[in-house]
């Protein structure tokens, strides 16, 4: 009989600010709220891990929100709890969503040390005017720097999210309706 596998999704609902187009559960939160959430998340990971002991985790995806908005210490604690509580495949893909402006060289180094091996960067558009309309907190230049930092820290698997249709390419009346 083959090994049963599972995927693990961890939601971090915090963002610097909510983008206008985002339908995901996410919001800005102070440090105390984030700390309480991380503590609750660590308890849940410890609780559910033993219930999944028959499974090998092939993928861990840390999404949001903006998981990279959390401190690197909290992310290291989360990854440590995952490793203690779940059986990870030796070749498990472990991804984290990052937004330019919320990561540093040090954060990427901590992620790499914690076993994260895939970065997903939310670029959305390479046009600064469009990024502003979308409510993004970064510029295209900041994205390029973030991408280079990820590569410099040994991340060979870097995903870039780009929207296929954006508000700058539609008529002004339609844009107003979509934004409202």
For each of these PLM feature ranges, what is it?
Residues 8, 60, 94-96, 119, ...:
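Hydrophobic faces of well-ordered beta-strands that scaffold small-molecule active sites
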Residues 11, 108-126:
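Non-cysteine beta-strand/loop elements that form the S-adenosyl-L-methionine
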Residues 168-180:
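Single conserved hydrophobic/aromatic residue that forms the stacking wall/gate
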Residues 85, 114, 149-158:
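A structural motif corresponding to the C-terminal end of an alpha-helix
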Residues 119-120, 131, 136, 156:
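Active-site-proximal cofactor/substrate-binding loop regions of enzyme domains
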Residues 25-28, 51-85, 99-109, 126-142, ...:
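Conserved glycine-rich "GG(E/T)P / GGGxP" loop and the immediately following alpha-helix
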Residues 41-53:
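A short, N-terminal amphipathic alpha-helix
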Residues 3-36, 131:
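Canonical Radical SAM [4Fe-4S] cluster-binding loop centered on the CxxxCxxC motif
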